[in-house]
Amino acid sequence: MRSATYRPPGLVLTEHEFEVPVDHARPDGDKLTIFAREVVPTGRENEDLPWLVFLQGGPGFEAARPTKPGDPVWLEPALKDHRVLMLDQRGTGRSTPLDVDGMPPDAQADYLKHFRADSIVRDAEFIRVELGVRQWSVLGQSFGGFCVTTYLSLAPHGLAAAYITGGLPPVDRHIDDVYRATYKRALARNHAYYARYPDDRDRVRTLLERLESEDIRLPSGDRLTAR
């Protein structure tokens, strides 16, 4: 573990880097670096505060980069009685990036399966043990909520509490049922939108035709498509 501490106004930020296995079932195999930022209010860095781990949504988004106690907005109330750990999940932010360039398809699929919620949870457990924390709480937003429920399944012994603000897996339902309901809801919302703004129908159609006929790129270099 490597650490460095910074002190923006109102906060003490300690940045940690942990070396974890790509495949936790093969601890002697290839390694990844996981980045996590510990956040505590100024003047309370030496207190024995309970830990709260934030699991970001996405998947594919890094954790927020706080510059003050109220950024993001949930951070300030959380810091009243917690030491917050903001985790860049594997493949995101300052953790080892996800790179499958040059791999054959089978190797890509085998590598990508190690970037799911189960591996993210095992990373968190590795970090908990490394930091010497007996138990901590987790807060999951969107995809982070799926990570929280996976955490409850795989390592409940490591948790004092679990909070979900979005991303709750269905119970006794197949994911296809959820998507069928989602598509119907999206279609209904589209009808409602165009009923209110009928002139936008031609505008959107023009945009779709342009996306089909032109190679328009996002800042990441990926092509922007209509699908």
Where are each of the predicted segments found?
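Gly/Pro-rich cap/lid or specificity-loop segments adjacent to the active site
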Residues: 2-221
